[in-house]
Swiss-Prot record:
NCBIfam families: mscL, PRK00567.1-4. It comes from the Bacteria. GO terms for molecular function: mechanosensitive monoatomic ion channel activity. Homopentamer. The keyword Ion transport applies. The keyword Cell inner membrane applies. GO terms for cellular component: plasma membrane. It is found in: Cell inner membrane. It comes from Actinobacillus pleuropneumoniae serotype 5b (strain L20). The chain crosses the membrane at residues 10-30, 76-96. Channel that opens in response to stretch forces in the membrane lipid bilayer. May participate in the regulation of osmotic pressure changes within the cell. PANTHER family: LARGE-CONDUCTANCE MECHANOSENSITIVE CHANNEL, MECHANOSENSITIVE CHANNEL MSCL. This is Large-conductance mechanosensitive channel.
Length: 129
């Protein structure tokens, strides 16, 4: 079997295609969430705490020197990334809950006791007397 044929069989399998679609949609969803956080969520929060732009929040660790930029601890960008993560985590958790609820089969009614179980129950009840 040629390598090209093996690869084609591998790539066409359902799991690989599903995973590829998931990765592409996940990347697009991540961009949407990043835009939501940086363009919609963070500006009002920054405005509420005194007109702060979170992108610019940083602490200078070492000043700029000739030929080198200042070393900055950009904690504002980190805060935005935390918001990104939380929104994505909540969305994924919600989707997993819905999918699990759909996949979960309706619980079957308890099975009728077998003849042996009925007999053992009668014996137990007689011994209790």
């Amino acid at each position: 079997m040629s390598i090209l044929k093996e690869f084609r069989e591998f790539a066409v399998k359902g799991n690989v295609v599903d995973m590829a679609v998931g990765v592409i949609i996940g990347g697009a969803f991540g961009k949407i969430v990043s835009s939501l956080v940086s363009d919609v969520v963070m500006p009002p929060i920054g405005w509420l705490i005194g007109g702060v732009d979170f992108k610019d929040l940083a602490i200078e660790i070492a000043p700029a020197k000739e030929g080198a930029e200042a070393v900055m601890l950009k904690y504002g960008a980190f805060i935005q990334n935390v918001f990104d993560f939380l929104i994505i985590a909540i969305a994924v958790f919600g989707m997993v809950k819905v999918i699990n609820k759909i996949k979960k089969p309706a619980e079957a009614a308890p099975a009728e006791p077998t003849a042996e179980e009925k007999l053992l129950t009668e014996i137990r009840d007689l011994l209790k007397k």
